[in-house]
Amino acid sequence: MTLSKAIKFSLGVFPIFLQLSCIEAGASPIKTNGNGDPTDVGIWYCANWDANGGGWWPMASYRPLLPDGSYGMHDGSDVAVIDFHLQKLAEAQIDFILFDDTNGDFNGYGPQNVWIKEKSKAVCARIKLWNRSHSWKIKYAFAIGSFMIGDREYPTATSYDVIEQQARCVAQEVFLNSDYDTNDYYQIDGKPLLVVLDYNKDARTRWANHPSGKAWANRFAIRWAGTSGGYSVAAGDYGWAMNAAGVLLHPEVEYLQPGHDNHLPAGAGWMHTLRKNGDYYVNNWDRILGNPLPRIVMIGAFNDYTEDSAVWTADTSVDYPKSRLPIERWQGHDVQLHPSMYWDYTVGIIRTLRHGAPKPIMAGSAPASGGAADRRHP
């Protein structure tokens, strides 16, 4: 065999080996453009923050860590903050972020929210620069909504054509736009990922039966969120709120959160999920790592401070008037505040997933028992 043929052969064998590794792990053999590990890690990302306390800040009593070491509010398109986030995401070895543009941001379905997609696109521009000069690549994808069909707050959303039209906008404004790099968009089997938030259990069937054109949507790998009813996650969904059953095992994607909407009154329903001093997050990761790994682990969320699901470092010591209260303080079992407890755990547990490192200890908790978690891929 000549050297050139040997090289071609080895290049051909590697994708097959990677695919077989995923099959042995129980993962779906889908192909992605992540960083090459058998399991990719994605995380929801919110850009819906405006300068001087605008945007969705009035609803949030969380104040995230800023590049200068202080805690406070920031603009979703602030270059220094975006670059800081990208640095931390890369250090954590997260493969892609999923933009929350579910509130009619594209095609003007929610005119009051159009500004949010512009903030998201500002992050895309910084990712283009980041990926040019860093070995760990950060990809991105977009989440849109079809939940608003028939909602009087979204008068132009009248049918499942909303998916086609938002897909067209994402393609034209981002994926095919030369201001960005198509290689930076997270892809599944060669198609850019587009997640659709819908609260109907039969959302997939409704979309499949929609009679209008789907030329733009067919260019995407369409996936779903919230289809267990009432926005809770079903098996194979990429979000939204966790089902009461906890992590739902699935070969393609498994979704987990540290908590969700814990400002709501106890007993308010599925959306009220307490963090329990970090135990809820730890237990969710234990379930993922104790079973054959999926192709994608999806975390909700990096910085969703309005629905109480963030893991990025934040100060939770103050209740700001007129925000969504009460929030659940980020305390360990030692009853001390630990602003970075969820981010530190996220970084550590991804090392366990990828490299078999010992499980991290949640801040303020007793040491984890045993050594490395049970990893079911080679």
Predicted features, each with a name:
Residues 22-28, 362-378:
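Enriched but not universal
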Residues 3, 14, 370-372:
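Coiled-coil-like amphipathic alpha-helices with heptad-repeat character
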Residues 1-11:
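Bacterial N-terminal signal peptides that target proteins for export
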Residues 10-21:
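Bacterial N-terminal signal peptides
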Residues 28-364:
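Glycan-processing catalytic domains of CAZymes
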